[in-house]
């Protein structure tokens, strides 16, 4: 009985950890949307800012991957 409650808590925690993946998607959308907005205002500067955009996307996606790993650890290690 006690093991079932612990397993249920692990599944609830894994579900809550997955909300970080939604936050990563919002972050990537924000970064790319602002880049496109800036590129439309000043197309000549867009080429020099592309690398910065990809770094921002990588950081936002890293948070999503970390939350996914936490969810996997909660589901299978607890």
Curated annotation (Swiss-Prot):
Gene Ontology CC annotations of this record: plasma membrane; plasma membrane-derived chromatophore membrane; proton-transporting ATP synthase complex; proton-transporting two-sector ATPase complex, proton-transporting domain
Disulfide bridges in this chain: none
Residues carrying the site annotation Reversibly protonated during proton transport: 61
SUPFAM superfamilies found in the cross-reference section: F1F0 ATP synthase subunit C (SSF81333)
TM segment ranges: 12-32, 54-74
Alphabetic keyword roster: ATP synthesis, CF(0), Hydrogen ion transport, Ion transport, Lipid-binding, Membrane, Transmembrane, Transmembrane helix, Transport
Chief location category: membrane
Location relative to the cell: Cellular chromatophore membrane
Pfam families per record: ATP-synt_C (PF00137)
Gene3D superfamilies: F1F0 ATP synthase subunit C
InterPro entries: ATP_synth_csu_bac/chlpt, ATP_synth_F0_csu, ATP_synth_F0_csu_sf, ATPase_proteolipid_c-like_dom, F/V-ATP_Csub_sf
Gene Ontology MF annotations: lipid binding; proton-transporting ATP synthase activity, rotational mechanism
Similarity comment: family membership: Belongs to the ATPase C chain family.
PANTHER family associated with the record: ATP SYNTHASE LIPID-BINDING PROTEIN, MITOCHONDRIAL, ATPASE PROTEIN 9
Quaternary organization: F-type ATPases have 2 components, F(1) - the catalytic core - and F(0) - the membrane proton channel. F(1) has five subunits: alpha(3), beta(3), gamma(1), delta(1), epsilon(1). F(0) has four main subunits: a(1), b(1), b'(1) and c(10-14). The alpha and beta chains form an alternating ring which encloses part of the gamma chain. F(1) is attached to F(0) by a central stalk formed by the gamma and epsilon chains, while a peripheral stalk is formed by the delta, b and b' chains.
HAMAP family noted in UniProt: ATP_synth_c_bact (MF_01396)
Protein's name in the database: ATP synthase subunit c
Organism: Rhodobacter capsulatus
